[in-house]
A protein has these predicted regions:
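Short loop->beta-strand "edge-of-pocket" segments that line small-molecule binding or catalytic clefts
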Residues: 28-45, 130-148, 181-182
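A ligand-binding cleft/hinge motif common to bilobed small-molecule-binding domains
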Residues: 82, 89-101, 182-209
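A conserved helix-loop-strand patch within extracytoplasmic ligand-binding domains
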Residues: 110-153
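Ligand-binding clefts/hinges and TM-proximal coupling segments of bilobed small-molecule sensing domains
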Residues: 146-157, 235-270
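Extracytoplasmic small-molecule ligand-binding "clamshell" domains
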Residues: 26-101, 231
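Periplasmic-binding protein-like
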Residues: 36, 113-118, 195-232, 254-270
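Extended ligand-binding regions for polar small-molecule ligands
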Residues: 53-57, 124-125, 215-255
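Short helices/loops that flank or line small-molecule/ion binding pockets
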Residues: 67, 71-88, 157, 169-189
């Protein structure tokens, strides 16, 4: 009986310590609820995963990535993020002060890279594009872009002709059949995309780069400011110790060199 009593007392003494350890373990894990990409062919963003993992590690945290069951386009992502319910973080390029309930980090995730799209074209059309020397010559040609994508608004605002009604497969078919002329795509993804599309007689146009101000930040609802502050602190540490720049070069440095960005004709948009 005495042994049972002693064991009970010991358990009561250890219980708070065990509970405290459990709480501290849970506090060291950050659950990030993210949106699954609307294009099911798009792989998970390894750069974003690596950046978030490093940033929270600087704060002594581990990250658990939890993706939504249903895919979301940009419009849906903003809507869900504004509800502060299903997702709690997204990386977006949004007009300044357009969503007062959403707060964002201060450092540009891609260092403006998404504002330098290249063009996917039909291989037979490269000589035609090589002769284009001004944006005015490009504007009458039919560009492809989904209306929910940020490039669509930029192209329309700058007077380009854009078909925004097709899904991704429809766009690539339109290029192949000559119903459209070019498909602006991010430097970060265009090479991988064209590799997948090689059976469709498509290529990366070799001479032109569009450029406009575009900066992606991590956004969350203002109710999640504690999460955002933790992430911001981690990102600033990465910037200070050079790991941010190192990670960017690891993922995009070679792509920038291989795509010869510095030697292309640049058409500046606003």
């Amino acid at each position: 009986m005495m042994k049972l009593y002693n064991f009970s007392v010991l358990w009561l003494l250890l219980l708070p310590l065990a509970f405290t350890s459990f709480v501290h373990a849970n506090e060291a894990i950050v659950n990030l609820h993210l949106a699954s990409p609307s294009n099911t062919d798009t792989p998970r963003n390894h750069y974003i995963h690596a950046l978030l993992t490093l940033a929270f590690a600087e704060q002594g945290k581990q990250v658990d990535f939890i993706y939504s069951i249903r895919p979301m386009n940009k419009k849906r992502v903003v809507e869900e993020l504004s509800k502060a319910s299903s997702i709690n973080l997204a990386w977006l390029s949004l007009p300044a002060n357009s969503y007062p309930d959403l707060h964002h980090t201060s450092l540009s995730i891609y260092q403006g890279l998404h504002g330098k799209p290249l063009l996917i074209i039909n291989k037979n059309q490269q000589p035609r594009f090589a002769e284009i020397s001004t944006s005015a010559q490009l504007k009458p040609l039919i560009a492809l872009q989904k209306q929910s994508w940020s490039d669509y608004d930029v192209l329309i605002r700058n007077g380009f002709t854009v078909n925004g009604e097709l899904d991704y497969k429809g766009m690539t078919r339109a290029l192949e059949t000559g119903l459209a002329d070019y498909f602006p795509r991010s430097v970060s993804a265009i090479a991988a995309e064209v590799t997948k599309l090689q059976h469709q007689n498509l290529m990366i146009e070799q001479t032109i780069m569009l450029q406009y101000p575009s900066h992606y930040y991590f956004y969350t609802h203002k109710q999640n400011d504690a999460l955002l502050m933790e992430l911001e602190a981690g990102l600033l540490k990465l910037q200070k110790n050079g790991k941010f720049a190192q990670l960017y070069q690891q993922f995009f440095g070679e792509k920038e060199r291989d795509l010869a960005l510095s030697s292309r004709k640049v058409f500046h948009l606003n």
